[in-house]
């Protein structure tokens, strides 16, 4: 899969997922306590006095330079699928996947971060809040990332 295909796949996924959430939530996909730092993610009808606001899907502001800095900080390159996941839209998922808001675009990845796992070929990207499990990409078959499983 090319970078363009990975990004289009993620774009299609997010748009369908949020559309489904909006249908289930009577027009509201996700409600979150959003502050001023994430104002770009507020839906247009949000009241600034309310702590909880409807979260709208917006294009990611994460740049290639941001990804390069993250990769340098964590000591490994991101597979295309995770790169696309982080760079197509700012999004929110329940744990363990977590959120990717404007104010902290790598929040979920940093929350799951464990250098020992990376040293042994696993890239953590999601962590259950209760600490019961970490979701990782098995990097054993890189650069053939289509053969890299999720564990």
Where are the regions that the model predicts?
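Short, charged/polar, Gly/Pro-enriched secondary-structure boundary elements
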Residues: 143-146
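A surface-exposed partner-binding patch
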Residues: 1-141
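Compact, glycine/acidic-enriched structural inserts
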Residues: 148-151
């Amino acid at each position: 899969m090319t970078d363009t295909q990975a990004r289009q796949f993620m774009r299609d996924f997010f748009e369908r997922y949020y559309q489904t959430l909006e249908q289930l939530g009577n027009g509201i996909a996700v409600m979150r306590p959003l502050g001023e730092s994430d104002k770009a993610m507020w839906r247009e009808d949000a009241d600034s006095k309310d702590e909880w606001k409807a979260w709208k899907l917006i294009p990611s502001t994460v740049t290639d330079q941001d990804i390069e800095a993250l990769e340098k900080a964590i000591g490994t390159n991101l597979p295309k699928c995770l790169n696309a996941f982080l760079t197509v839209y700012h999004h929110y998922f329940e744990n363990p996947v977590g959120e990717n808001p404007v104010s902290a675009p790598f929040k979920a990845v940093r929350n799951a971060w464990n250098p020992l796992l990376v040293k042994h070929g696993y890239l953590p990207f999601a962590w259950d809040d209760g600490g019961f499990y970490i979701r990782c990409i098995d990097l054993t078959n890189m650069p053939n990332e289509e053969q890299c499983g999720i564990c």
